From Swiss-Prot:
Belongs to the UPF0325 family. It comes from Vibrio campbellii (strain ATCC BAA-1116). It comes from the Bacteria. This is UPF0325 protein VIBHAR_03240. It holds the Pfam family DUF3461. InterPro entries: UPF0325. Disulfide bonds: none annotated.
Amino acid sequence: MYPHLTGLGIHDPKQIERYSLRQEAHKDVLKIYFHKQKGEFFAKSVKFKYPRQVKSVLVDSGSHKYKEVTEINRNLTLVIDELNKITKPAKTTEVDVKEKILSDLRHLEKVVSSKIAEIEADLEKLK
């Protein structure tokens, strides 16, 4: 189900709690944190370093100047996709969205009704 994580030696992906990604020089550093086990003071974590891919990009076609740029390693993007499936919450369903919109609408109706009553009361005071 998670072939790239398994390839990194992570055999129980459900134990993953979160991850962090940072760049150091010409490497991306991925750190994966696991849920803290009973009796442990700190959660276990593992660190992986991926070299950044270097590409030459044409900056000025008139003078044919190129600039070296780095980008994230393709394998790392695949690992991050799998990590996002584990750590990010599932998208809300259409029914949940509809219920939220209806709830917001009912709340707005109450706010508007209250404001109208307040303005009418202010008008009565002016008479």
